[in-house]
Amino acid sequence: MTGGSWDEAYRQNNVPWDIGRPQPAILRVAEWGGLVEPVLDSGCGSGEHALLAASMGLEVKGVDVSQEAIERARAKARQRGLSAEFIVGDVLALDRIPRLEPPFRTVVDIGCFHTFANADRPVYASSLAAMTDTGAVLHLLCFSEHTPGTDGPRRVTQGEITSTFSRDWEVESIEPETFAVSNLWSGPTPSAWLARIVRRCRGSSAVPRR
């Protein structure tokens, strides 16, 4: 989907992933100290996970291709009196967004990775690598292949996560989780994978381009 397509989904409120609160899986990550500033929320949508970090007093920036989603995130930040910067941009080319100012120590991806075509996955992994240094942690939550049906985003296997992040990253763990959705979702609660992925020593290779 293009930025305009995501904008239209938000305008029509056809956004079952937007539950008005953080995903429970990421709340647990935050509770055990898994969010360390500065934090990057990649594909932040309407901002709930960036705002979770902000509510903990952490420096955080969120990026999304949808102008509509970013406007909603900014409005939430104002309403809640929280400090978080939200930027319209392409997460496949994060190094082209000057306002990001890497490196980030934590990246969260909540429902972004599972929207990509196969060819975009390694581009995304390299885009995130360009924003981080050795030891940074990516927390990734995506639909798993155990979610029945074909509605919604692509289903992702553990092997696909591991292969995508085999360069510049090390997958430390992949745990079964669920992906909370709104009542716009007609099926059972989606099954998900929660991966903890650590940045390896920075290499000298260029970021792959589409």
Q: Language-model segments: what does each one mean?
A:
Residues 1-40, 46-102, 116-131, 136-210:
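Class I (Rossmann-like) S-adenosyl-L-methionine-dependent methyltransferase catalytic domain
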Residues 105:
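Conserved acidic residues
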